[in-house]
Amino acid sequence: MVSTNPPVLPISTTATDTTNQPPIVTAVVESQPPVVRAFVNGVTETVCGGLSRSRPWSELLDRSAFTKPDSLSEAGTRFRKNSSYFRVNYVCIVALILGFSLLAHPFSLILLLCLAASWLFLYLFRPSDRPLILFGRSFSEYETLGGLILSTIAVIFFTSVGSVLISALMIGIATICVHGAFRAPDDLFLDEQDHAASGFLSFIGVPAIPSVAPSASSAASPV
């Protein structure tokens, strides 16, 4: 009897499924880093651009320029001029005081970092077309935003974070107020208009002081 080989049956594999899955997973994973990278690059460029417009610290701390104001109105005028001229330096001083205060209170720093990470990864960097899923439950955009707002209120007002932030801000504001009131601005504002229009965090700055050159020329012209 002649033996015949059994017919070869086609065997189906799931190779197509495995080959199609990695690109989908890769696309999902790689869709997040560019957003984070763009955010970090934007913040870095903003900070570096603002710091490049700061005034020399030797000019800020020039001891020969500190004099006692004659009146409260003069102190207010000095502060207004100095805050416009040293706006970037003042922001750096407040930021340094705030940073040292948080470093002195590690628990508050950890809570604040966790809160910031929650806002970044659960709301800002999360795709808007994908709902947030936690513990098997899907949360809508408004539910996520409401939860983050309530968490922020709870962390700031019911923990030590609020007191640390408020005390640091008060110390920083008091420091720049004292400096602005006692620093005589007679030698300042030589090129103020170039810097006031593009200052660091310009939304906290005061409007630029107009130049006195046009008024002086108009006063010198004959009637």
From Swiss-Prot:
Where, if anywhere, are coiled coils annotated? none
InterPro entries named in the record: Prenylated_rab_accept_PRA1
Record's GO cellular component, any one? endosome membrane
Keyword Methyltransferase carried by entry: no
Could you tell me in which tissues this protein is expressed? Expressed in roots, lateral roots, lateral root caps, columella cells, leaves, and shoot apex.
What are the subcellular locations of this protein?
Endosome membrane
- Keywords from the named record: Endosome, Membrane, Transmembrane, Transmembrane helix, Transport
Q: Which domain of life is it from?
A: Eukaryota
Asked if the record carries the keyword Transmembrane helix, the reply is yes
GO biological process per UniProt:
vesicle-mediated transport
Q: What quaternary arrangement does the UniProt entry report?
A: Interacts with PRA1B1, PRA1B2, PRA1B3, PRA1B4, PRA1B6 and PRA1E.
This molecule's function is given as: May be involved in both secretory and endocytic intracellular trafficking in the endosomal/prevacuolar compartments.
Q: What is this protein called?
A: PRA1 family protein B5
